[in-house]
Amino acid sequence: METRNAVSKDVLAGELEEARERTRLLLKSVSEEDLVTQHDQIMSPLIWDYGHIGNYEELWLLQKSHGKVLSKRELYDMYDASLHPREERPSLNLLDRKDAELYLDAVRKAVLETLEDADLGDGKDPLLKDGFVYNMIVQHEYQHNESMLQTLQLKKGEGYKPESRVELPAGGAVEEEMVPVPGGEFVMGTDDHARALDNERNAHVVDLPGFLIDATPVTNEAYLRFVEDGGYERPEFWSAAGWEYIKEERISAPKHWYQPEPHSWWTERFGFDEPLDPAAPVVHVSW
């Protein structure tokens, strides 16, 4: 076995494991009821995401890459996002937590076994070359971690307390003056085959006019000034479609913001109420 392949395989196996640890940590404190409930019509039940993670891994790292199949056709169909829109997924005969964990473990065991003999060199298989398909699966699992967090933010009832969390360092002063970026040519995209998806390739030169940009994301404090200055009542700040949406939905502030009393702003975060953090980046403003 080549040293380059052996090292890359160790890295790939470690990244697959790290992604799985995050997924399980994310779901560990979620109740069985919350796991199977569809908390919003635009989201899947969490248990569907969990099973889909394993089935997608089987599809790409076993079936398509090595011609190995563990599951019956019914399981592939059940976790195929193109066959079942989100409104259908709660009615499917989904794996429960225990069976999903057993399934994910079985898939991962087979994946690591086939990884040992996989040719990640300059072979003819574009999926295996440089470990592309393994990196794709790691990214896919993290994408569903994000979807799960969206679901947990949208769910009602008992608040979500993660098993553990990383405390962020205290922020410093925010520079509100915009930074000028001179125009000119720059390289957009990448030629990296191992980790970039097709919509990120290939590298190409783009000529961009000069522009101004904030040095940091817009903070809650800055956006609150826009809200209190009547920004949601002035159509000149919005596109036609955005203004129509604001009027139809009667939106007057970012989602989850509310005022328990005048001049006091709070937000609901994963089911818990907390004062609006002025230094945090504003979120939930897209339509």
How would you name each of these model-derived features?
Residues E2, V7, V11-A19, R24-V30, ...:
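Extended beta-strand/loop cores of jelly-roll/beta-sandwich
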